[in-house]
């Protein structure tokens, strides 16, 4: 039986069985209930079994529902309570269409709702002007904190939305051409797009993406990756047996392989530059990144 340093062996605990079934399937693990008493597991079950959705019913959500979900998302942690993140709800059809065209993923035009989570360092600088205090943190952290804050808010939105039955799919491709996204959304200096999100009532459930084993990604006290090559190989084999990509990347450059695994896909993906101009865009927004 497999064990993990911080996790004990599985135990009999029928009320949490679905949660641990989902976790153990995703991570190929033998996790069991903790010693602590946990009465409510609905959110945990939803998160453990989550999957991205790219097919939706056509109807839009009410603005009231979107505002409720945004408020819930913005209740998530924020570095030093700086609240350096904003959400743009894209309801204008022309803007939606232009962003979808820029990203280039065929499912996005049919997503009923498109949101863009932005990092915002402008507001902090404005506060310094209003309070007549010098802004002495014009370095990498001025960009990094809003970027992380926006990512946290996006994940909180996903958790909230999926808890009521909505489906979501994050869109990193919103950064494929940040100049276009910034123009469409009229983002000022020191405000930048971090991630998009397609949202709607799902019509089909996507597959659950199994993850790397916890031995590879959860560490106790010290980071260790002595066995990472073997762990990735085992993960490749398991993932390929469950679900693997239908299309191979860059066949003209790397050819076709009989067994197209996760690591092969990721190696091919990052064998070509992606968003190499993102740093220049961020600097054009007024960030020094020093």
Predicted regions and their residues:
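Acidic, surface-exposed loops and disordered segments
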Residues: 2-290
């Amino acid at each position: 039986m497999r064990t993990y340093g911080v996790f004990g062996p599985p135990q009999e605990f029928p009320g949490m069985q679905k949660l641990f079934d989902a976790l153990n399937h995703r991570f190929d693990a033998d996790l069991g209930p903790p010693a602590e008493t946990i009465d409510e597991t609905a959110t945990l079950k939803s998160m453990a079994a989550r999957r991205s959705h790219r097919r939706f019913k056509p109807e839009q959500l009410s603005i009231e529902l979107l505002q409720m979900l945004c408020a819930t998302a913005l209740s998530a942690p924020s570095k030093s309570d700086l609240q350096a993140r904003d959400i743009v709800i894209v309801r204008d059809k022309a803007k939606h269409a232009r962003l979808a065209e820029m990203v280039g993923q065929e499912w996005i035009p049919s997503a009923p709702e498109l949101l863009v989570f932005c990092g915002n360092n402008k507001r902090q600088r404005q506060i310094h002007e209003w309070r007549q205090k010098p802004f002495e943190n014009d370095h990498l952290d001025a960009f990094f904190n809003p970027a992380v804050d926006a990512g946290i808010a996006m994940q909180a939105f996903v958790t909230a939305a999926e808890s009521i039955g909505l489906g979501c799919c994050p869109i990193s491709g919103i950064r494929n051409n940040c100049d276009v996204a910034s123009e469409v959304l009229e983002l000022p200096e020191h405000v930048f797009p971090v991630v998009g999100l397609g949202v709607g009532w799902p019509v089909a459930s996507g597959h659950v993406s199994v993850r790397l084993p916890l031995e590879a990604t959860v560490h106790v006290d010290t980071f260790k990756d002595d066995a990472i090559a073997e762990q990735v190989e085992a993960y490749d084999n398991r993932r390929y047996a469950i679900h693997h990509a239908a299309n191979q990347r860059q066949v003209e450059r790397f050819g076709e392989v009989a067994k197209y695994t996760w690591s092969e896909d990721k190696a091919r993906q990052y064998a070509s530059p992606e968003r190499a101009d993102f740093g220049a865009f961020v600097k054009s927004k007024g960030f020094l990144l020093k």
